[in-house]
Design a protein with these regions (language model features):
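Acidic/histidine-enriched, beta-strand-rich ligand/metal-binding domains
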Residues: 12-92
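Short, Lys/Arg-enriched N-terminal segments with co-localized hydrophobic residues
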Residues: 1-11
Length: 92
């Protein structure tokens, strides 16, 4: 089952979300971040930056991912709460 959710809320940076099984894909309206994909089973968060770089951040808890998705500034939340506190691997 796949769900596509489109959000148009002025204070939120999410453009759309796709929920497909264990993956949640988020398109982000940010000066630095382009997309984020969260694996609900492994808690890995894969982030694509606007410059094309792709990084996978490990063991990001569901509640932290939810706060990231709903943050007024997803880039700021990401930098302060995910990028600096989770192990990561460069994917591309």
């Amino acid at each position: 089952i796949m769900y596509i959710i489109t959000l148009k809320i002025s204070n939120m940076a999410i453009i759309s979300e796709t929920i497909n099984g264990k993956m949640i894909d988020v398109v982000i309206n940010s000066s630095n971040l382009k997309t984020a994909s969260f694996n609900t089973e492994t808690e890995d968060l894969t982030v694509t930056f606007n410059n094309g770089a792709i990084y996978e951040y490990n063991k990001v808890p569901w509640n932290k991912f939810t706060k990231f998705r709903l943050a007024e500034s997803q880039g700021k939340y990401f930098n302060e709460n995910i990028a600096r506190s989770h192990k990561y691997t460069k994917k591309g």
